[in-house]
């Protein structure tokens, strides 16, 4: 009988890049469905448009580099980047914004540094920051959740609003006729109210806040949390970064809330508002741009959580995950250098 001789580690199952990406995309679907349920068809349209642009850019770059187009498209990394950009921007943002952001993510952030596995920054978050800094008004104008809006746009209405086609007078009248077609998120509303001298309790008495979190956003975050837990169960990601992000945000927001409950939101609000669960399980866990050792991943995640709280409360933008992730990406080599695991048989570095 012939025995196959193989060196360690003796892995019993191989997880290819395409398999990992497929699992991440599938686990994103619950959050995407709930997000569409609360914020309309615009989110799905943005995701589909981003996928088309991302795959086209990926194929074009591979053609220019004389690489295999089929192999590059089949790893599903471009599709995942497109979906993350699509769910991050407002549902009714103009079509050219999602096109610009996706092209920037794939061509500049990903392939300018050598392609998959070589990019320094998370492509989706780099694209989001580009759009947020360049077009702050459009990037902070979210459609009102379906549970509080007097009317919500249909599929046709969403297409016309995104692509700015049809009867322009009618579309403008439609925009003005919907109460809250463009509105601030709960994070932005709280930040604005606190700057005007209102207390947290007074601000959260508004209808946009649903029992201390935010209409729609609690369920969206809960759906992404469920998908993230499945992702952990499938071992597509490790628990260190997600735990670090949530723990860092929870501890920082708890300290702030205990010191000044009138001007600081509760930890529950921070955990289930904005892009918290999406970022903790699907964005910060990008293995290319994160720290590599288990202890380093915990520090990396905790750094993101603390930075999110600082920027949310002291910065100029209501949600801060994109900035926090990019800043942590910068710190990842530093963390890896000083948090190296001890090699067996050698002293600690």
From Swiss-Prot:
Q: Does the keyword Transmembrane helix apply?
A: yes
Q: Does the keyword Lipid metabolism apply?
A: no
Q: Which GO terms describe its biological process?
A: electron transport chain; transmembrane transport
Known cofactor(s): FMN
Q: Which residues cross the membrane?
A: 36-56, 77-99, 124-144, 212-232, 239-259, 265-285, 291-311, 315-335
Q: Which InterPro entries match?
A: NqrB/RnfD (IPR004338), RnfD_bac (IPR011303)
Q: Where in the cell is it found?
A: Cell inner membrane
Q: Indicate how the chain sits in the lipid bilayer.
A: Multi-pass membrane protein
Keywords for this entry? Cell inner membrane, Cell membrane, Electron transport, Flavoprotein, FMN, Membrane, Phosphoprotein, Translocase, Transmembrane, Transmembrane helix, Transport
Enzyme Commission numbers on file: 7.-.-.-
Broad class of where this protein is predominantly found: membrane
- What is the role of this chain? Part of a membrane-bound complex that couples electron transfer with translocation of ions across the membrane.
Binding partners and assembly: The complex is composed of six subunits: RnfA, RnfB, RnfC, RnfD, RnfE and RnfG.
* Protein name from the UniProt record: Ion-translocating oxidoreductase complex subunit D
